[in-house]
């Protein structure tokens, strides 16, 4: 059967299969490789590939003859990802995190100089955190707040963070700009933030950043418990679980961490 005489459904199925195959090969695929991989006649594959190239969905390298994903695909993916609700993505991961750690989990976003809780998952039991969805907290005294403000552009950070805004919530609260800036540098280095009884005495919290497709900070996810629950012995396990959850949420939002060069 001539490729032009294929039924529309078969042609569409083959075109989508080709796009997926090329998308999974960073070095690209040639017509022959695609035909062999998908068991499609070379004449049919050639016709569909030319059409996809003409429409901007694929790019063909003249030297190697290999096809790679085109910018049209990127624009479509951005449109799809822009409609993703971070709460919807994060909630099942947060529930799993709570089951794993038996701690309260919060999802927060930055709104002006404050961190706002937009989701909360609690474990079963008698210990309850005095927090709720919609509660606003100054960024300097919470782990989710520090995780948010640590990754915004420096100019915006300096506007948000000022000593006037650093209310002393407990004797352990950071209330000076130099100390907070040093703390935020530590957050960026280790990839997570800690609230060590800085917002409420007897409570210790850990927060990690969530990034979007553009690599910008989108939200932060945090785990909260008593100082007995979050201590020197349990902290490494809690941090590992939290960072893993934040990474999974970020990936579902389209984020891809940059590859580190060997020796860099």
What are these regions (language model features)?
Residues 126-199:
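Short, solvent-exposed recognition segments
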Residues 1-88, 250-255:
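N-terminal helix-turn-helix
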């Amino acid at each position: 059967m001539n490729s032009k005489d294929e039924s529309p459904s078969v042609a569409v199925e083959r075109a989508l299969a080709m796009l997926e195959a090329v998308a999974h090969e960073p070095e690209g695929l040639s017509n022959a490789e695609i035909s062999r991989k998908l068991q499609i006649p070379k004449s049919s594959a050639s016709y569909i590939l030319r059409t996809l190239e003409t429409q901007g969905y694929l790019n063909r390298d003249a030297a190697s003859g290999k096809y790679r994903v085109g910018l049209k695909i990127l624009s479509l993916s951005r449109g799809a990802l822009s409609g993703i609700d971070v709460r919807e993505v994060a909630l099942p991961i947060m529930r799993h995190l709570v089951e794993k750690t038996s701690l309260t989990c919060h999802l927060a976003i930055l709104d002006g100089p404050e961190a706002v809780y937009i989701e909360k998952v609690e474990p079963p039991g008698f210990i309850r955190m005095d927090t709720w969805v919609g509660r606003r907290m100054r960024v300097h005294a919470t782990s989710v707040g520090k995780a948010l403000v640590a990754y915004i552009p420096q100019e915006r950070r300096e506007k948000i963070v000022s000593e006037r805004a650093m209310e002393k919530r407990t004797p352990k609260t950071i209330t000076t700009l130099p100390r907070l800036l040093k703390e935020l540098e530590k957050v960026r280095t280790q990839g997570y933030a800690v609230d060590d009884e800085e917002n409420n005495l007897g409570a210790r919290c850990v927060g990690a950043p969530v990034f979007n497709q553009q690599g910008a900070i989108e939200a932060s996810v945090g785990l909260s418990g008593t100082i007995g629950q979050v201590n020197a012995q349990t902290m490494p396990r809690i941090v590992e679980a939290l960072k893993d959850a934040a990474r999974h949420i970020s990936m579902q939002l389209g984020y891809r961490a940059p590859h580190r060069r060997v020796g860099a």
